[in-house]
């Protein structure tokens, strides 16, 4: 009943607010206006193309043309103030004072101190920020084909690790900020899209993104409370501005090629091996084939992207609408994705600009085919003398002695795994300035994400043969409602207005509902209907139909106050209090405070004669954040689950038993962080950057422990027990190497070092000495783990037999306990999957109308387990299966083992992105504002000592599932989807 009342209240509130929104959307207040024009120049007197000109206090703005000229209609020629900004230059303000022509000159700054940066529930200039916030604008995004915001950011932010260890175009990247801080799956940053927390990056087309801010320390992220322990990524999408209607088109075509593939024996090499061993291979070699199975499963993937947008506005409103179509075809023949993205935004101002009303919405529709990784396991082991097709055109289906899954090409062509996603959201906000500087704002948000997964295994394939066809359907839906109220106050005071105060109070209410339905069947008469007629199967079993639903609610209050004096002394204090239905009865509410301060050293009087220092600021902050995303609803409650069925009195009945113990003390994980940073800009802005040190401590980590029965009914229980710490240093350097009228060269380097350690795993009630994790799935050694999690060690610690070499085809294993036998008791610590150093190096060049850039990134000091070499550089299964053309294949005399022999240096440097563009002179074409043609290449080459396919593997995912995600990094899996080398040709047009 209480929940129904809550929904009714929320519904009534939505109706009232949305009614007000719509009633004012058509309202515009009359204001005296006038036209002002001029030119924007750099420090050398050269025109700046594409500089932003905005009337202060409004979203009324425009950009400069090819000659640096602008024209803008302002509300009041006497009172209007123009704000001019451009990437790499200081933002300045120029009062119009009745003039019709205003020339503006910008001074360069590598670290743009006037740049406005999103900080969560507000913005600040970079000069006044007291926390650790990194901002990446559109000009600095990675170029070429991109799936979502993570592709734009990869390698750009010190301390933010983004890995895409798979060539599967449907699979997103993993993001981790400042190391691993939990034992749970969900440890990535909180995604906030246009102020709405809890977003999904895949629902925003990269072409719609204007900038991305990363809140790196707890003092910045604490305003998001129990969901911000992994950091916060703020995505700001493009909005309409200016008085001119603008149409933009961005399009490209891209070509994917396999960057690297396994070096397997071909037919002649396989025969040569058999002859050298005196083996009779005639039973296999009857078909005259020489098949490269990886070539048969892959292709050159051709992709295309088209994005069109319409934007504009006037002195009282602005709008933008866009549509993006992405057709992505991977290098695996059964891997593709088609995505349609729609987005709109509208804002209206009224009542002398005191009232602002905004509407926004988005819809994303995605259809994709997910590749079956087992086919690539088959490609490793299928003999090269086997053909793809028989002489009559049918598929060759001779049994593979190592992995009885049939012909991988047949599997790829006849079996199907499809995902269909539909996402939409609608949002409305209304803001009113009660008095000067005091604003009240209400936001409403509604979203729904649905996923339909469909699978069919054809009865003609070995995979589907045993079931005579197997079909599966799964439907899932996530519904979310959010309402937020904020009251913010901005005031400058004092005789010279050097004192500035900004404060915000807020209330947030949201509910989330998840539901699913699952069904599967087998034994179909025909394959033609695929997964579209489950009822036609004749093999339904117990457990083939399932459905479920869960619900949770989050209520929050938050506040932040920021004070600055003369840009010299700044302090920020934040607090958030979260109440979640996920938490146990004894811990329903959590409080997350933070405080940070900054000293603008360069603003002091004693620094005024130090001309080579343009800006110098020291920052320090401490805060507490939480992680509740790894905690599922109802985990604190005693639950019953189905235990089986039984026959009673002529009827089948279902039996139930306790499947989860109650834990009223279950709560969020808590992360406290101390951050100290130094920001600097030197030599007239030619050299700038940031140096930061942090100490991050996580406590009350969630993990599922074994518990005694009795007193507990169930032998597993999730509890808050463990502690972990991360300490690190981050460096960002920006350098203008050359800066003149015709040629510019800018260089950027980011470095990060993080040290991780688990400091506690057990308590008096819940104990575990070690957590063994990571199954490399090596044939002949299945079930043997590769990692250990224990106190005093980092996450990613390899723990296995120590091998000092190979002699006479056998491993030389160290007998550590000296008992004369090699067993699990001889395992030891042999390396760490976490790198000592992560880096990114960007170079940008401009010459006249040409622009060129390249970007390297890499890691130093990490280990990678070369799992394919362990599994396939061995002759144990020869000659019935294929193997790598490796010296070990010819010399080994025993089965593969999980040992340190296959642990290799995973350090690498990758030329990740290269782009060359030309911007045409369009000043003689009055209907065309901008035309740019560009070429981009991604993943061009990798420099590494690693002998496998690619040293950059999924750093935070398990081998074959996500059950131990984050606890067994650094394994190149057997189900490795080959990465692509991509070449892109694109065009940007603005009308």
Task: Name these PLM-found stretches.
Residues 262-295, 384-412, 529-550, 643-661, ...:
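Flexible glycine-rich, low-complexity coil/linker segments exposed to the extracellular/periplasmic environment
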Residues 832-864:
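Glycine-rich, aromatic-lined ligand/substrate-binding cores of catalytic
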């Amino acid at each position: 009943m209480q929940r129904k009342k809550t929904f009714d209240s929320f519904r009534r509130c939505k109706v009232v607010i949305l009614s007000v929104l719509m009633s004012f959307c058509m309202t515009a207040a009359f204001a005296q206006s006038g036209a002002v024009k001029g030119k924007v120049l750099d420090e050398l007197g050269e025109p700046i193309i594409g500089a932003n000109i905005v009337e202060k206090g409004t979203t009324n703005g425009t950009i400069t043309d090819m000659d640096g000229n602008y024209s803008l209609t302002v509300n009041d020629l006497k009172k209007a103030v123009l704000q001019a900004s451009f990437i790499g230059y200081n933002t300045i303000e120029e009062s119009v004072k009745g003039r019709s022509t205003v020339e503006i000159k910008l001074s360069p700054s590598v670290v743009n101190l006037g740049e406005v940066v999103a900080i969560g529930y507000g913005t600040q200039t970079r000069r006044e920020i007291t926390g650790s916030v990194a901002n990446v604008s559109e000009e600095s995004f990675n170029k070429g084909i991109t799936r979502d915001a993570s592709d734009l950011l990869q390698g750009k932010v010190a301390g933010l690790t983004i890995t895409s260890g798979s060539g599967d175009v449907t699979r997103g990247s993993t993001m981790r900020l400042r190391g691993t801080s939990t034992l749970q799956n969900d440890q990535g940053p909180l995604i906030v899209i246009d102020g709405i927390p809890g977003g999904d990056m895949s629902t925003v087309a990269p072409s719609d993104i204007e900038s991305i801010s990363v809140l790196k320390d707890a003092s910045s992220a604490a305003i998001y409370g129990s969901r911000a322990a992994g950091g916060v990524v703020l995505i700001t999408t493009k909005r309409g501005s200016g008085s001119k209607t603008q149409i933009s088109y961005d399009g490209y075509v891209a070509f994917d090629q396999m960057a690297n593939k396994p070096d397997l024996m071909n037919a002649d090499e396989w025969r040569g091996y058999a002859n050298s061993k005196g083996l009779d291979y005639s039973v296999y070699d009857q078909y005259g084939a020489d098949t490269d199975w990886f070539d048969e499963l892959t292709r050159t993937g051709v992709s295309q992207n088209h994005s069109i947008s319409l934007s504009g506005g006037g002195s009282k409103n602005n709008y933008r609408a866009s549509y993006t179509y992405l057709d992505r075809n991977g290098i695996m023949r059964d891997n593709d994705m088609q995505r349609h993205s729609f987005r709109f935004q509208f804002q209206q101002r009224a009542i002398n600009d005191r009232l602002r009303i905004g509407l926004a919405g988005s819809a994303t529709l995605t259809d994709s085919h997910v590749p079956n990784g087992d086919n690539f396991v088959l490609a490793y082991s299928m003999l090269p003398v086997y053909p793809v097709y028989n002489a009559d055109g049918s598929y060759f289906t001779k049994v593979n002695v190592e992995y009885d899954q049939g012909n991988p090409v047949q599997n790829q062509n006849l079996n199907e795994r499809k995902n269909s996603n539909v996402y939409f959201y609608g949002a409305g906000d209304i803001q009113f300035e009660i008095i000067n500087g005091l604003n009240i704002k209400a936001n409403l948000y509604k979203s729904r994400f649905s996923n339909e997964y469909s699978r069919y295994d054809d009865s003609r394939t070995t995979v589907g043969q045993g079931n005579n066809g197997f079909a599966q359907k799964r439907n899932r839906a996530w519904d979310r409602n959010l309402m937020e109220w904020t009251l913010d106050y901005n005031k400058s005071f004092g005789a010279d207005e050097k004192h500035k105060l900004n404060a915000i109070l807020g209330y947030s209410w949201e509910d989330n509902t998840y539901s699913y339905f699952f069904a599967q069947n087998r034994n179909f008469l025909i394959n033609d209907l695929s997964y579209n007629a489950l009822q036609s199967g004749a093999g339904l079993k117990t457990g083939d139909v399932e459905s479920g639903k869960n619900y949770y609610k989050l209520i929050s209050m938050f506040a932040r106050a920021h004070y600055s004096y003369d840009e010299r002394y700044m302090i920020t204090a934040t607090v958030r209090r979260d109440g979640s239905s996920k938490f146990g009865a004894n811990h329903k509410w959590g409080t997350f405070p933070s405080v940070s301060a900054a000293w603008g050293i360069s603003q002091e009087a004693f620094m005024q004669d130090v001309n080579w220092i343009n800006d110098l600021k020291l920052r320090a902050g401490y805060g507490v954040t939480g992680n509740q995303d790894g905690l599922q609803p109802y985990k604190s409650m005693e639950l019953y689950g189905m235990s089986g069925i039984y026959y009673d009195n002529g009827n089948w009945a279902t039996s139930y038993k306790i499947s989860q113990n109650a834990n009223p003390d279950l709560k969020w994980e808590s992360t406290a962080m101390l951050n100290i940073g130094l920001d600097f800009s030197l030599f007239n802005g030619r050299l700038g950057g940031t140096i930061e040190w942090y100490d991050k401590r996580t406590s009350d980590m969630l993990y599922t422990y074994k518990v005694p029965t009795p007193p507990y009914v169930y032998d597993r229980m999730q509890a808050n027990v463990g502690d972990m710490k991360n300490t690190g240093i981050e460096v960002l350097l920006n350098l203008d190497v050359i800066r003149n009228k015709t040629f510019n060269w800018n260089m950027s380097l980011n470095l990060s070092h993080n040290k991780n350690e688990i400091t506690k795993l057990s308590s008096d009630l819940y104990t575990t000495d070690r957590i063994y994790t990571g199954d490399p799935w090596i044939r002949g050694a299945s079930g043997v783990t590769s990692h250990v999690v224990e106190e005093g060690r980092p996450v990613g610690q390899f723990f296995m037999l120590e091998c000092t070499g190979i002699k006479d085809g056998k491993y030389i294993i160290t007998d550590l306990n000296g008992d004369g036998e090699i067993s699990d008791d001889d395992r030891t610590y042999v390396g760490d999957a976490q790198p000592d150093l992560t880096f990114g190096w960007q170079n940008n060049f401009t010459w006249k109308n040409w622009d060129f850039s390249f970007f390297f990134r890499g890691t130093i000091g990490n280990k990678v387990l070369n799992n394919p070499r362990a599994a396939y550089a061995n002759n144990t299964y020869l000659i019935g299966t294929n193997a790598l053309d490796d010296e070990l294949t010819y010399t080994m005399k025993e089965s593969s083992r999980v040992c340190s022999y296959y642990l290799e240096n995973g350090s690498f440097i990758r030329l990740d992105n290269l782009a060359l563009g030309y911007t045409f002179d369009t000043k003689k074409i009055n209907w065309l504002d901008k035309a740019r043609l560009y070429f981009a290449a991604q993943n061009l080459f990798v420099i590494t000592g690693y002998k496998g396919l690619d040293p950059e593997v999924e750093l935070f995912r398990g081998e074959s599932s996500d059950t131990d995600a984050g606890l067994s990094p650094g394994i190149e899996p057997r189900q490795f989807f080959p990465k692509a080398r991509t070449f892109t040709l694109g065009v940007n047009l603005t009308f």
